[in-house]
Amino acid sequence: MEFPDLGAHCSEPSCQRLDFLPLKCDACSGIFCADHVAYAHHHCGSAYQKDIQVPVCPLCNVPVPVARGEPPDRAVGEHIDRDCRSDPAQQKRKIFTNKCERSGCRQREMMKLTCDRCGRNFCIKHRHPLDHDCSGEGHPTSRAGLAAISRAQGLASTSTVPSPSRTLPSSSSPSRATPQLPPRTTSPVIALQNGLSEDEALQRALELSLAEAKPQIPSSQEEEDLALAQALSASEAEYQQQQAQSRSLKPSNCSLC
């Protein structure tokens, strides 16, 4: 007696055996016999969906959960950066304490990389204003520019302070007190250099310092030095004249054939 509707044939092309107790693969949903139901025996193309492995942290030996489709190396790296309890990981977190403030980025750096426009801290990849969609306005000012502005403001404040002799009225003639005019605000560079260029102002300062350091020489000594210098120059000129005359009077050894 035959039962044609009982059982099913094996889906393996090389087998095709009629099995009365067929088995269904939970990965590819194929029907196989007991000999080919394993993933490796029928070369299942969907076996990777069931081959789930949980990576283990190499430092603390704790299993790290991984989402579907996420690389295990990335999950282990984030676990070491945030949740690992081992000594090397905790020491690393103490060094890399500057977290990037861009949304979605978890990178940490050893030093602060602050944006000059918005003032927030970012990692190396997102330190430029275009990389983190900077909301700050205007162009950033460098540290040298800020220092120059502060120096100019300091010079301007010192140049505009009135002297005590101008502000205090004279006690001898109180009736002749004149109304004081507001001080003029001049440029700190012009007030410092008196309208000269930088090279001229530097040369003028050097001349003044040399004049102050030079000792006062009596006028008689200056006259003696001048006379001595004139005598030396005259003797030098006379010697050169004698040398020129001796060279001109020297007979020439050249002869024309």
UniProtKB/Swiss-Prot annotation:
Question: Is Phosphoprotein found in the keyword set?
Answer: yes
The entry's cellular-component GO terms read: cytoplasm; endoplasmic reticulum; endoplasmic reticulum membrane; membrane; proteasome complex
Superkingdom of the organism of origin: Eukaryota
Q: Where is this region: Disordered?
A: 153-187
InterPro entries per the UniProt record, alphabetical: AN1-like_Znf, UIM_dom, Znf_AN1
- Residue span(s) of domain UIM: 197-216, 221-240
What residues bind Zn(2+) 3, as annotated? Answer: 100, 105, 123, 126
- Residues noted as binding Zn(2+) 2 in the record, renumbered to the chain: 25, 28, 42, 44
- Comment on protein domains: The UIM domains specifically bind 'Lys-48'-linked ubiquitin polymers. The UIM domains mediate interaction with polyubiquitinated proteins.
Species source reads Rattus norvegicus
Per its record, how is this protein called by name? AN1-type zinc finger protein 2B
Q: What does this protein do?
A: Plays a role in protein homeostasis by regulating both the translocation and the ubiquitin-mediated proteasomal degradation of nascent proteins at the endoplasmic reticulum. It is involved in the regulation of signal-mediated translocation of proteins into the endoplasmic reticulum. It also plays a role in the ubiquitin-mediated proteasomal degradation of proteins for which signal-mediated translocation to the endoplasmic reticulum has failed.
Per the annotation, the residue ranges of the short sequence motif CAAX motif are: 254-257
Q: How does the record describe its quaternary structure?
A: Binds 'Lys-48'-linked polyubiquitin chains of ubiquitinated proteins. Associates with the proteasome complex; upon exposure to arsenite. Interacts (via VIM motif) with VCP; the interaction is direct. Interacts with BAG6. Interacts with IGF1R (nascent precursor form). Interacts with DERL1, FAF2, NPLOC4 and UFD1; probably through VCP.
Q: Return one Gene Ontology term, BP aspect.
A: regulation of insulin-like growth factor receptor signaling pathway
Keyword Acetylation in annotation: no
Modification Phosphoserine occurs at:
163, 173, 187
Which GO-annotated molecular functions does the record name? K48-linked polyubiquitin modification-dependent protein binding; polyubiquitin modification-dependent protein binding; ubiquitin binding; zinc ion binding
What are the TM regions of this chain, as residue ranges? none
Alphabetized, the UniProt keywords read: Endoplasmic reticulum, Lipoprotein, Membrane, Metal-binding, Methylation, Phosphoprotein, Prenylation, Repeat, Zinc, Zinc-finger
